[in-house]
């Protein structure tokens, strides 16, 4: 029994470089699901005057957006099946901490790092 692996990667970048892994394989070649973050080569967005290399990676913001969209769609699918997933509330809003404490109490045996 295995797990399904998902990669968020920059396909333009990976197409322009050789693998540094001893297997000579790249991430997208060993994962079941591959999501292209559509970044530029070298994952950089700006070339400032006097610089030899570009700076300002886009993969961080795009990757976070992709992951958050996956979470949103997953919650939508669960709700459509009548399942209300335990989602933490922002602790910075009134009542947020109390709301989260209920979840902590309910799932305390499964949340070992808290």
Language-model segments: residues:
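Glycine-rich phosphate-binding loops that contact phosphosugars or nucleotide phosphates
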Residues: 1-65, 71
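Short, Lys/Arg-enriched charge-dense amphipathic segments
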Residues: 32-33, 62-69, 102-114
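Active-site phosphate/pyrophosphate-binding segments
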Residues: 76-114
């Amino acid at each position: 029994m295995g797990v399904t692996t998902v990669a968020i990667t920059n396909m333009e970048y990976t197409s322009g470089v050789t693998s540094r892994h001893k297997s000579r394989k790249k991430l997208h070649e060993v994962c079941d699901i591959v999501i292209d973050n559509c970044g530029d080569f070298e994952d950089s967005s700006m070339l400032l005057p006097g610089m030899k290399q570009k700076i300002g990676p886009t993969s961080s913001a795009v990757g976070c957006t992709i992951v958050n969209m996956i979470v949103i769609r997953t919650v939508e699918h669960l709700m459509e099946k009548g399942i209300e997933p335990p989602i933490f509330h922002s602790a910075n809003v009134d009542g947020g901490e109390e709301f989260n404490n209920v979840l902590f109490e309910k799932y305390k045996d499964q949340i070992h790092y808290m």
